[in-house]
Swiss-Prot record:
Localization: Cytoplasm
Membership in a protein family: Belongs to the D-alanine--D-alanine ligase family.
Organism, as annotated: Citrifermentans bemidjiense (strain ATCC BAA-1014 / DSM 16622 / JCM 12645 / Bem)
Function: Cell wall formation.
Reactions catalysed, as given in the entry: 2 D-alanine + ATP = D-alanyl-D-alanine + ADP + phosphate + H(+)
Any single Gene Ontology cellular-component annotation: cytoplasm
Protein name: D-alanine--D-alanine ligase
């Protein structure tokens, strides 16, 4: 859609929601809403709850900019509702969203696409743990983002606590072999890589606090990688985005070793849009200001089914 066509439509920025990432989503949504209003769009913010269908109808929403993170927002739930209501929306569709947030399902697809993954095992609530990889390992819920519930276990005495924490958020968890590498994240827009940023967290890894606390991590743009490795991580980012059938934009997370191996961690279909978020920073490095990034995402809004 052209900018002129979009400015005639009532746009809702969907934010907040019911997940463990609610506060981050509110920050993303407020930033997007402020940008849209500044650019002259008829935009309103909606804090998503179980009354979302009624709110969308009452506001006579014609297009939705999804700024939700985590469950009930990034997992295909809201996307399915918008499809049923005939409201075009930003980001990926129902299936790609559901696959991306499910780390177990997405790993199967990534492996079939030839993408490199850390060795892992799946543990379901109630099952006995028979550790398949030597310590250290990374324990994480299957369907959460922003490193919620994630822990690194180096000592056997800490394993149960890490399992308990991950099971707080999901009935299925992943236990991955630890990869010693640089944390590198690739920004994707309209299916093409914008660039790659390197993250150096102040703590043990890039956890929730490091992601959303000013000064919690050092960002290096572009990532300090040899030219050939940098090109490869961009290519792998585009490949992962396409493998899940993602639409328009995403952020793809990797660990890159000293030998240049790029281990794929996950694809985020609704990456953060806050002042500390990485996709806007990567886009800025490619010459795309925040307002322009918001506009390009909005212009790609559509029904996917």
């Amino acid at each position: 859609m052209t900018v002129e066509e979009l400015k005639k439509k009532k746009i809702a920025v969907l934010m907040g929601g019911l997940s463990a990432e609610r506060e981050v989503s509110l920050n993303s949504g407020k930033a997007v809403l402020a940008s849209l209003v500044k650019q002259g769009f008829r935009a309103v913010g909606i804090d998503v709850g179980r009354d979302l269908p009624q709110r969308l109808a009452e506001e006579q929403v014609e297009l939705a900019f999804i700024a939700l993170h985590g469950r009930f927002g990034e997992d295909g739930s809201v996307q399915g509702l918008l499809e049923l209501m005939g409201i075009p929306y930003t980001g990926s569709g129902v299936l790609a969203s559901a696959l991306a947030i499910d780390k177990i399902a997405s790993k199967v697809i990534f492996a079939s696409a030839g993408l490199k993954l850390a060795p892992y095992q799946v543990l379901r609530r109630g099952e006995e743990l028979k550790l398949a990889n030597p310590l250290p390992v990374v324990v994480k819920p299957s369907r959460e983002g922003s490193s919620v519930g994630v822990g690194i276990v180096r000592d056997p005495s800490r394993m149960q606590a890490a399992l308990d924490e991950a099971f707080r958020y999901d009935s299925e968890i992943l236990i991955e072999g630890f990869i010693d590498g640089r944390e590198v994240q690739v920004g994707i827009l309209n299916g093409k890589a914008l660039g790659a940023i390197e993250i150096i967290p102040k703590g043990e890894f890039y956890d929730y606090e490091a992601k959303y606390t000013d000064g919690g991590a050092q960002h290096i743009l572009p990532a300090r990688l040899p030219e050939a490795v940098y090109a490869e991580v961009l290519r792998q980012g585009e490949k992962a985005h396409a493998a899940l059938g993602c639409d328009c934009y995403s952020r793809v997370d990797f660990l890159v070793t000293e030998t240049g191996d790029c281990f794929l961690l996950e694809v985020n279909t609704l990456p953060g849009m806050t002042d500390l978020s990485l996709l806007p920073e990567i886009a800025g490095g490619a010459g795309i200001a925040f307002g322009e990034l918001v506009l390009r995402i909005l212009q790609a809004a559509s029904l996917k089914i």
